[in-house]
């Protein structure tokens, strides 16, 4: 997400935009404030429940709900039986899980930033990550790599992963299970937004 936004804003500033529509793992409030987004009121918005619009920070035509990714804990049960698996986010700090956890890099994922912020400020506090770091989690660039290491068993616990990836993997026959953390899951809203300099604005509106 961060790399994509950087490319989008650079092209916008240079006057050579290649994108009509952004599809990102965040709610693009700052992009709206900085003048990058076009406002478009689609009639389809009436079909979206108000409760969903609240989650997406009342977009007012500047972005539209896409999906909501449910972040949970993933376990390779061939290497960590469910009876021994973490039951909560807090359990990820337990020393018995040292050298077993895989985690995506927040420098490349807006979703991971949301997970870290939620755990550090709402579910627990920032001391959580000091204890978590002591467990030597492996940090990889993205969630695709998280899934690869999880499935291979090299790192049998995904410290955060989208539920759909875990479910898809399980349905393919992999020994992957989902842990629904006791403190609650973390939801990341993905949004559509139209560039104010969209090369094909009518096509962008049609997509939205």
Please tell me what each predicted stretch does:
Residues 28-31, 156-175:
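A ligand-binding cleft/hinge motif common to bilobed small-molecule-binding domains
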Residues 1-9, 17-154:
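Extracytoplasmic ligand-binding site segments that recognize negatively charged/polar headgroups
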């Amino acid at each position: 997400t961060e790399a994509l936004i950087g490319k989008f804003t650079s092209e916008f500033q240079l006057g050579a935009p290649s994108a009509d529509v952004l599809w990102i793992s965040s709610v693009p409030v700052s992009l709206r404030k900085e003048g990058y987004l076009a406002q478009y009121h689609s009639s389809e918005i009436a079909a979206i429940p108000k409760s969903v619009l609240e989650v997406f920070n009342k977009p007012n035509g500047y972005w539209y709900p896409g999906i909501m990714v449910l972040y949970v804990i993933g376990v390779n049960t061939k290497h960590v039986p469910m009876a021994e698996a973490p039951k909560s986010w807090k359990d990820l700090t337990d020393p018995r899980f040292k050298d077993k956890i895989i985690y995506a890099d927040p420098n490349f994922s807006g979703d991971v930033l949301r997970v870290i912020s939620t755990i550090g400020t709402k579910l627990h506090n920032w001391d959580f990550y000091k204890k978590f770091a002591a467990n030597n989690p492996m940090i990889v660039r993205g969630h695709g790599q998280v899934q690869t290491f999880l499935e291979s068993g090299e790192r049998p616990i995904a410290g955060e992963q989208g539920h759909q990836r875990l479910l898809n993997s399980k349905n393919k026959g992999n020994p992957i299970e989902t842990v629904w953390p006791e403190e609650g899951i973390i939801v990341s809203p993905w949004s559509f937004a139209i560039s104010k300099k969209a090369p094909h604005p009518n096509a962008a509106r049609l997509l939205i």
